Amino acid sequence: MRFNAAQLLLNRTRRRRRRRRNKRKKMTGRAKRKPKSSQDSGTGNGELKKARTDESKAVPLSEVDSEQRDEMVRLYKLQMPEDLYHFWDFCKELCPDSPRGALKDTLGLQLVGPFDILAGAHKNSKNPQPNFHLHWRYLYDPPEFQTILLGSEETQHHIGYFRDTPDSLPAFVGENEAKKSCTITQMGDNVFAAVLSYLLKRRKEKGSKKAEALESLEAKLRDRAEALGLSLEQKTKGMKQRDKKVVTKTFHGAGIVVPVDKNDVGYRELPETDAGLKKILKAIAEARNDEERVKAFGPLQEMITFVQFANDECDYGMGYELGMDLFCYGSHYFHKVIRQLLPMAYSLLKRNVFGEILEAHLSSRSHDNLDQLSAH
C-alpha cells in the first residue's frame, strides 16, 4: 500500500513537471519553487559562485599572514572570508593583550572558533585531539553554520557564518540561541555588520548603562567597516539575491539552496507542511512506548520512500530538506534517519565536508562541553 502511494506521488510529480515545462505555472504549496527568471541554476556540479556579489566589494587584505590562513583551512577545511581577519586586526587594536575578550565588557561577546586559531590557543590545547568541526558547535547548529562569537551562556546565544556550500564564502552571518530554539536569524554579510546589529539591539535594552562605551565602539566599527568597504546593512543586496535561490526555509528559517535546472530538476517539495511534519515528529519523540513509536514512524517512513524516488530523479533537495528538518527538531530518536538522509544529500550535492561535520556532530551532540580546546 505504501509503495503504491509512493508510486502515485512519483507519477503526479512527473505530470506536474511536464506541465511546468510547457506553461511555467506558478508553484503553490509548501516550499514555493522560484521560476527560472528569479532562481538561477547553480554552476556545473551545483556549487555556488565562490565569492559573494553584494555591497561588500574589493576588501583589502588584512595583516594576517598566509601561514595562519593556511592553518585555518587545514583545521576547518573551510575558506574564511577576509572580514574575519580584518575583525581580528580590529580587536587586536581595541585590546592588544586579549583580542578575544575585546568585546566582553561592552557587549558580553567572546571571540571563539577561528579566532582561537589566530590567537594560537590551539597550540596549548588541553585536548590532545581537538576536532574543529565540533569546536563551539551547539545542539541545533547545522553543518552550514560555524560559530565565531559567544554571547549569553544562559540562552547559549552565539553568532556565526552560514555557508551554502563548503567551498563558497559565507552567505551571511547569523545568530542562534540554542537553549530556546533552532532558529537562525540573519545579521548581515560580515562580522562587522553582525556586531553592529547586536550592539544596536543591546543599547536599546541597556538604556543609559555603558552608553558612552557603546557609542565609542559603534563609531569605531562604522569607521573601520567604511574604510574597508564592508556593508553594514542587515540585509544586503547579495543576501536578497540568495533569498531568491532558497528553495525552502526549513525549520531553522535560514533556508537551503540547491541547484535547480531549467526543467525544475533539483528540488521537489515534501508532501507535508511544516506544521504537519512537526506533528508527526512530536508523535514519534513523545511516544509512550516502543510499540507506539514504531506505529508513529509510519508517515515518516513513507516520506523516506518519496525521498528515494526523488534522489533517483535528481531532486536531491527533498532529502536535504527532510534530513535538515529532522536535525533541527533535535530529538535523538531521529539520528538514525538523519544519517540515512543528510550524508547522502550532501554527497549527491558534492558538499562532502558538511557530511563529515554532520557525522562528527551526531556522534557527540550536546548542550555542554563545546570547547574542543579544553580537556575532554
Regions found by a protein language model. Name each.
Residues 113-116, 190, 273:
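Short, solvent-exposed coil/turn linker segments
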Residues 5-6, 13:
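Ala/Thr-enriched low-complexity intrinsically disordered regions
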Residues 205-376:
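Charge-dense, low-complexity intrinsically disordered regions
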Residues 2, 25-162, 310-376:
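A surface-exposed partner-binding patch
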Residues 167-221:
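Compact, glycine/acidic-enriched structural inserts
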Residues 13-23:
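Compositionally biased low-complexity segments, especially N-terminal hydrophobic helices
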